[in-house]
Design a protein with these regions (language model features):
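Conserved N-terminal phosphate-binding loop of PLP-dependent enzymes in the Aspartate aminotransferase
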Residues: 1-95
């Protein structure tokens, strides 16, 4: 779907996006320090990213170094695009 394809584009753009995985709208985005070793980013980086996203209106859960996106099943394309734009902008700033 659209969200997964946008996240895969971010994975290609940012070396620290180590993996994008999950079925349907239950998506995990793993952030790493090194794309080869897959060493996780630190908790401070994850916290900084979360707060930047919250400031822009995007809320998500994280489990250590994995962003857990679970948008509602009724999300519109416009809402999905806005969420992905916010996430991409915040990834550029926070990591």
């Amino acid at each position: 779907g659209y969200i997964t394809s946008r996240l895969k584009e971010m994975q290609d753009k940012f070396a620290f996006v180590g993996d994008v995985r999950g079925p349907g709208l239950a998506i995990g985005v793993e952030l790493v320090k090194d794309p080869v070793t897959k060493e996780p980013v630190d908790d401070t980086t994850m916290e900084r990213l979360l707060w930047r996203c919250v400031q822009h209106g995007l809320f998500y859960q994280n489990a250590h170094n994995v962003i857990k996106l679970k948008p509602p099943l009724i999300i519109t394309m416009e809402q999905a695009a806005e969420a992905m734009n916010i996430l991409e902008h915040c990834l550029e700033e926070a990591v």
